[in-house]
Amino acid sequence: MKKYTIFLLAFALLLALAACGAAPESPGSAEGEYSFTDDLGRTVTLDRPERVAALIGSYADVWCLAGGRDTLAAAANDAWTSFDLGLDDSVANLGAIKEPSLETLLSAEPDFVLASCNTAANLELMDVLESAGIPTAYFDVQGFEDYLNMLDICTALTGERENYQTYGLDVQSEIESAVARADGSAPTVLVIRATGVSCKVKGSEDNVLGEMLAALGCVNIADSDSSLLEDLSLEAIIKAEPDYIFAVLQGSDPTDAMATLEQTLLTNPGWGELQAVREGRFYTLEHELYNLKPNARWGEAYEKLADILYPQK
């Protein structure tokens, strides 16, 4: 099956290259080539791009923040469903993140592709894109510093360096101000991610909200009880008695996720016995800020958590 898939990809590539063979080459940047190392350790060299494809919506958002909106030629479907980018019909929709359309991607004639290290479908396209001579950068954006690094590279490519200050360094200052509000009390927290089909407890790593809470001086109860990550146990939660409980409702429409959360936890009589619930310290949080990478809104996300954890008097 894998050989058949590779054959189809190669065949599609040959067709696309044949169709584009007579097209004039894009002129190079007056400033010359720009080189950087991506998060896979690959050296990427290119002129200022004129047609950019983003294989996940978050990276389309970063490219637009970097001043590249007018050069965005293609993006994954979540650029429309999860990010309010206001893209017009000139931007090709590549389809789902996990199943991008190679035909649509090549038809968009990108001269630069933004891809994710953590998405198998993106990694599978590497050889095809390299064979086509299309510069491709792979990024691994987990936390704010990773976002800042990507924004730095993207603003260098667009030439809009002032956007690095506005959407990067200024946001960093907002985060630092929020983190400085931590008073050393080290509140214990429970983090839950609810979808339309499941509820899972998350630790301090590999998720946006968990990492933010750790930076704000919180102690995640799942970090010391890894069994919670595998099996959501109300008994274990009651035993730990967290000071705060945060639930992220995944999806642009939280209705199904909220129904799952209610069915799994909220309707259980034991849930109402938790002190955090009784005293109003159970919060449902926005998907856009605490599940997706918030990008330019990272500072806002930190500030909202600081307002809950360390309210200013």
Regions found by a protein language model. Give the residues of each.
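Bacterial N-terminal signal peptides
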Residues: 8-18
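Alpha-helical, coiled-coil/dimerization segments enriched in small aliphatic residues
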Residues: 79-81, 201-230
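Structured C-terminal subdomain patch of bacterial secreted/periplasmic proteins
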Residues: 148-156, 162-165, 244-313
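A short, structured surface patch at a secondary-structure boundary
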Residues: 54-108, 112-118
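Bacterial N-terminal signal peptides that target proteins for export
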Residues: 1-8
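Proline-aspartate-enriched helix->loop->beta-strand connector
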Residues: 101-115, 134, 234-247
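Bacterial Sec-exported substrate-binding components of ABC uptake systems
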Residues: 4, 19-61, 161-192, 249, ...
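Extracytoplasmic ligand-binding site segments that recognize negatively charged/polar headgroups
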Residues: 121-124, 139-153, 186-208
